[in-house]
């Protein structure tokens, strides 16, 4: 029996399409014949419906997954205010505990063939006074997929984030170019530069280029991602 796969999705910034790309990956894995589940372990920004607190990002992931996890497993830490998680957690009296998330991830792996873990904000967003999301990725011990919001400044953000991932001893399984600014000048040249540098310095391939979509259509975006190559990388990276 093949061991379950998993990956950690991070981004060059907040609001650059991590949830959108994570949903596209889930659709892609499902088309690849895999049972795909999502974890959004820390979500900041909740709304109440029918007496239940929910999160829009988590809702989008559930809609894309073909294995839907119980809310308390999918998102063990749901914070109400839409702000930096460590700030909101302190205000709401919540301790963002990595061990709890690792336990949820372990359970999720028993229910699916592949588990997509979406971070919050960028790679070094704090969780508390001493730990950040990079520490969570290390604790999970899974490869990372980097979502690059293609806009002015993205080259520097992408290379810095890739360096931070490597500094934690994690494998960068690949990156996705997500066009968030349709008016950006020289997008092709920017992507070509990132493709060359990330391949040379980190061996990280470009998994796909997603054009600006309004409204976002993760099911369509899934067809633009090299899921087969990513699955092979994830399998090779297994201990």
From Swiss-Prot:
Entry keyword tRNA processing: no
GO BP terms in the entry: biotin biosynthetic process
GO molecular function: ATP binding; dethiobiotin synthase activity; magnesium ion binding
Binding site for ATP: 15-20, 57, 118-121, 178-179
Family matches, as HAMAP family: BioD
Cited NCBIfam families: bioD (TIGR00347)
Family statement drawn from the similarity comment of this UniProt entry: Belongs to the dethiobiotin synthetase family.
Name the record gives this protein: ATP-dependent dethiobiotin synthetase BioD
Classification lineage: Bacteria, Pseudomonadati, Pseudomonadota, Betaproteobacteria, Burkholderiales
């Amino acid at each position: 029996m093949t061991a379950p796969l998993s990956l950690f999705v991070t981004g060059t910034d907040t609001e650059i399409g991590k949830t959108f790309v994570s949903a596209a990956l889930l659709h892609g894995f499902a088309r690849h014949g895999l049972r795909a589940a999502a974890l959004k372990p820390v979500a900041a920004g909740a709304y109440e419906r029918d007496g239940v607190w929910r999160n829009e990002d988590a809702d989008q992931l559930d809609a894309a997954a073909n294995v839907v996890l119980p809310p308390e497993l999918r998102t063990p830490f749901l914070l109400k205010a839409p702000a930096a998680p460590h700030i909101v957690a302190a205000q709401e009296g919540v301790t963002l505990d990595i061990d709890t998330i690792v336990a949820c991830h372990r359970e999720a792996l028993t229910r699916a063939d592949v588990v997509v873990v979406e971070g919050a904000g960028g790679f070094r967003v704090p969780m508390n006074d001493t730990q950040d999301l990079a520490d969570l990725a290390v604790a999970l011990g899974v490869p990372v997929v980097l979502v690059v919001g293609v806009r002015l400044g993205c080259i520097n953000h992408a290379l810095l984030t890739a360096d931070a991932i490597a500094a934690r001893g994690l494998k960068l399984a690949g990156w996705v170019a997500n066009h968030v600014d349709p008016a950006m000048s020289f997008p092709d040249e920017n992507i070509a530069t990132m493709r060359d540098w990330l391949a040379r310095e980190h061996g990280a391939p470009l998994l796909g280029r997603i054009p600006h979509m309004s409204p976002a259509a993760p099911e369509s975006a899934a067809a633009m991602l090299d899921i087969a190559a990513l699955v092979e990388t994830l399998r090779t990276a297994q201990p």
